Swiss-Prot record:
The active site is at 296 (proton donor). GO terms for cellular component: cytosol; plasma membrane. Belongs to the UbiD family. Homohexamer. It comes from Aromatoleum aromaticum (strain DSM 19018 / LMG 30748 / EbN1) (Azoarcus sp. (strain EbN1)). Its cofactor is prenylated FMN; Mn(2+). Prenylated FMN binds at residues 184-186, 198-200, 203-204. It is a peripheral membrane protein. This is 3-octaprenyl-4-hydroxybenzoate carboxy-lyase.
């Protein structure tokens, strides 16, 4: 589904019955979360709250929620068309494109080179276009007008310490870098013009800030936060885009049109011209604050830690902006649905590097990425362990995967009954368990003994080959195909 911007996407979702307008007043304090959570768990539409209130005070802008509440809407956001509701095939095609761009194979001859040329031409033609004026700068708040209380920012859970900006697309650029980094980092509201930027040390924004501090000690670091962006750009920020391709360029490929950018009014950072709201400001070195606690995608409240403070100098927006928001909680939530959809993008990327992989699955119940199940065409003893370590190190997205289960290709890995059968019949607890200590772990994983550092486990649930066992290995029970066909033919007569 091709679209121009977030508003065009909303219109098309509504035409498909994938968006519901809520005209009744709904409070951004807890009520909005409860409604969005019930609708998402039922597989319902995106929601546009037209009359948000904050503790009884009416807000001027509508709130968009559950935009990516189903994998089907994620596929639509990536510019794909769905045939008969099939969202997996189009997302696999996106993954195949990324795999090709990440590691393009040398052409096998002139004809092959000619066939691949349009792909490279399309990538080159999708370089972002800078414009001088933009809808996102139609209204400008500066000085005393900057007040985050004027935005309908959600307070998601009873134990949350303050309202939280959840879908902020954070734009940064490190010193000497041409390419900007886009990342999604939550932001706790401290005051009318200050929020806490919760980015983990290995994330792109944090790395840009670290490099800036080393190169320009004592100078403020420019940051822009986009609230309400076209879906392709948001998804580009959470997709493993090759380093040779900018997220803005990838978004253009998905949308089928160049991403138009406009320079921020107070810095050289560029933001999507069609954005709804943009926060412009700086992070001052040494300016930090205690962040949290907040309910997170784990289903728990996270511990309190120090993170940099983002001071907002200016807020620019459309004349009638839409505030884009979400909540995170025990799966299923919107991040879980995103993870379910991106799972299909990951499969071709993994298969390009490891052709023996048949399928790969990140169960939503595993908090999007903490547990992975992979099936392989096993070729030699120890093969499963090679695949485990390959997955842990292949994409940044898998750095925090705590558990990997490897099975043979006769196991349907998206059926837990099949996976549990393989685990209980093909695993010896000592021989087939791989434990790796002192590895990077999600900061939010309170089960690890040290913040951001913990252990990983791999389980080899494949059939064992000579060299892996000295015993005769069991053969699965399978009915004779001729008998099955004969019973199929008589089935109606049996009255069963």
């Amino acid at each position: 589904m091709k679209y121009q911007d977030l508003r065009d996407f909303i219109v098309q979702l509504e035409e498909r019955g994938e968006l519901k307008r809520i005209s009744a007043p709904v409070d951004t304090h807890l009520e909005m979360t409860e409604i969005a959570d019930r609708v998402l768990r039922a597989g319902g539409p995106a929601l546009l709250f037209e009359q948000p209130v904050t503790r009884g005070v009416a807000q001027a802008m509508p709130v968009l929620a559950n935009l990516f509440g189903t994998p089907q809407r994620v596929a639509l956001g990536m510019g794909e068309e769905l045939a008969d509701g099939d969202w997996q095939t189009p997302l696999r095609e996106v993954g195949s494109l990324l795999a090709f761009l990440k590691e393009p194979e040398p052409p096998k001859g002139f004809r092959d080179a000619w066939e691949k040329l349009p792909v490279f031409r399309q990538v080159l033609n999708m370089a972002p276009k800078e414009v001088r004026s933009a809808p996102c700068q139609e209204v400008v708040w500066e000085g005393a007008d900057v007040d985050l209380a004027r935005l309908p920012i959600q307070h998601c859970w009873p134990g949350d310490v303050a309202p939280l900006i959840t879908w902020g697309l954070v734009v940064t650029r490190g010193p000497g870098k041409k390419r900007q980094n886009l990342g999604i980092y939550r932001q706790q509201v401290l005051s009318r013009d200050r929020v806490i930027m919760r980015w983990l040390a290995h994330r792109g924004g944090a790395l840009d800030f670290r490099d800036h501090q080393q190169a320009s000690s004592g100078e403020a670091f420019p940051v822009a936060v986009v609230l309400g962006c076209d879906p392709a750009t948001i998804l580009g920020a959470v997709t493993p885009v090759p380093d040779s391709l900018s997220e803005y360029q990838f978004a253009g490929l998905l949308r089928g049109a160049k991403t138009e950018l406009v320079k921020c009014m107070g810095s050289d950072l560029q933001v999507p011209a069609s954005a709804e709201i943009v926060l412009e400001g700086v992070i001052h070195p040494g300016d930090t604050a205690a962040e949290g606690p907040y309910g997170d995608h784990t289903g728990y409240y996270n511990e309190v830690s120090e993170f940099p403070v983002f001071t907002i100098d200016r807020i620019t927006m459309r004349r009638d902006p839409i505030y884009h928001s979400t909540y995170t909680g025990k799966p299923p939530d919107e991040p879980a649905m995103l993870g379910l959809a991106l799972n299909e993008v990951f499969v071709p990327l993994l298969q390009r590097q490891y052709p023996e992989i048949v399928d790969f699955y990140l169960p939503p119940e595993g908090c999007s990425y903490r547990l992975a199940v992979v099936s392989i065409r096993k070729q030699y003893p120890g093969h499963a362990k090679r695949v485990m370590f390959g997955i842990w190190s292949f994409l940044r997205q898998f750095m925090y995967t705590k558990f990997i289960i490897v099975v043979d290709d006769d196991v349907a890995i998206r059926d837990w009954k099949e996976v549990i059968w393989a685990l209980t019949t093909r695993v010896d607890a000592t021989r087939d368990t791989v434990l790796v200590d002192n590895t990077p772990i999600d900061y939010l994983d309170f089960a690890s003994p040290v913040a951001s550092l913990g252990s990983k486990m791999g389980l080899d649930a494949t059939n064992k080959w000579p060299g892996e066992t000295t015993r005769e290995w069991g053969r699965p029970i399978v009915m004779d195909d001729v008998v099955k066909a004969r019973v199929d033919a008589m089935w109606d007569e049996l009255g069963l």
